[in-house]
Structures are given as C-alpha cells and as structure tokens.
Amino acid sequence: MDEMRTEIRISVRALVEFILREGDLDSRTTGKTDLLAMQAGGRLHRKIQRRMGAGYQAEVSLKTRVSMGEFDCVVEGRADGIFAEDGLVYIDEIKGVYRDLNLIGQPVGVHLAQALCYACIYAEREELPEIGVQLTYGNLETEELKYFRETRTREELREWFFGLMKEY
C-alpha cells in the first residue's frame, strides 16, 4: 500500500527570499505606500507585457515537485513573461522600482534567483538545452526601462536549483 507523502508548498518568491535573505530594491524607501507601489507596479507590468507583442506569453504558471527524502516540495509561481528571440527562449522577470535605474549596475540577487528558478522549471518542462533570463527593471515614476540578460544551460540551472533546494 502506498503511503501518503507529506507535501510542502512554497512559492518561488518565498523560497528565494528565505534562502538568500538579502536587501531588496524597496519602493518603501521613498515613503510611497505599499498599495500605491503595488498598483503602479501592476500597471507597469501590464504595459511592458502589452508592448512585447503577440509572441510574449504573460503571467505563465510554472510548478515543479522535488523529492526531499521524507517529503515532497512543490515549488510554484508565475513567470512575468516568456518569449523567444533569435531562436532562444527567455524568461522575463519584471521589477518596478522607485529608483534611478542608472544606479542599478546588476540585478538584485533575489530577483535574479527568482528568474533562474522559473528558467529551470520551464527548461526542464520543455526540455530546452539552454534558456535566456531577462530581468526588466522599470522606474515606476518615469517608466524608463533597463534590461539585464544572461543565458544558462539546463544542466547549470538544474545544479543551481537543487543546491538551493538543499539549503531549504
């Protein structure tokens, strides 16, 4: 008789924030309320997603199950966007900030980790040998955009993701 395995569910965002525990580009540092920042962020997300055109899949649900010995961990979330360019599929993670984008020299670690999780889940599901990751930062007041891109192999992502899961 099969015994029921304990299942733990966690969002991609909660997972990376728990493991990496680092500072964030936080809209609250300017005195803006969380609600206003969330509303502005939602508007910016939708605007960017519409601008990307018909080939851009917005708000794609992704989920994976990882056996962790005595229990299973279900990691799930929603990629802001998925698109293909020059034969490479990209996971797009959009972040709205109240900060001068010129001061952002590289992606915030938790933002990159979130995108890498989605990239790993999607590359595994679609059996892609490699996948692109794009972080799109948008200033919530000016709507100026800044992009960071990188490419990873499925094997690199798998190794990184399972290392993250071991820490969890």
Stretches with model-predicted labels:
Residues 34, 101-108:
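Active-site oxyanion-binding pockets that recognize sulfate/phosphate
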